[in-house]
Amino acid sequence: MDIYVCTVCGYEYDPAKGDPDSGIKPGTKFEDLPDDWACPVCGASKDAFEKQ
């Protein structure tokens, strides 16, 4: 699975880890994140992420 990086703050979304603090389970692909999901560090939208 691909890792996506926030272009604003550098946070890496790793699908293997998910984002448990936001209720995103491990194994959730970036494409499957809810549209309203935001970077847990800086609050940037999904549009601010690029595939690593």
Swiss-Prot record:
Q: Where does Fe cation bind?
A: 6, 9, 39, 42
The cofactors required by this protein are: Fe(3+)
Record's InterPro entries? Rubredoxin, Rubredoxin-like_dom, Rubredoxin_dom, Rubredoxin_ET, Rubredoxin_Fe_BS
Q: Which UniProt keywords apply?
A: Cytoplasm, Electron transport, Formylation, Iron, Metal-binding, Transport
Q: Which GO terms describe its cellular component?
A: cytoplasm
One GO term in the molecular function aspect is: electron transfer activity
Q: List the Pfam families.
A: Rubredoxin
Cellular localisation: Cytoplasm
Q: What is its main location?
A: cytoplasm
Protein function: Rubredoxin is a small nonheme, iron protein lacking acid-labile sulfide. Its single Fe, chelated to 4 Cys, functions as an electron acceptor and may also stabilize the conformation of the molecule.
Q: Which family does it belong to?
A: Belongs to the rubredoxin family.
Q: Which NCBIfam families match?
A: RubredRD (NF045768)
Q: What is this protein called?
A: Rubredoxin
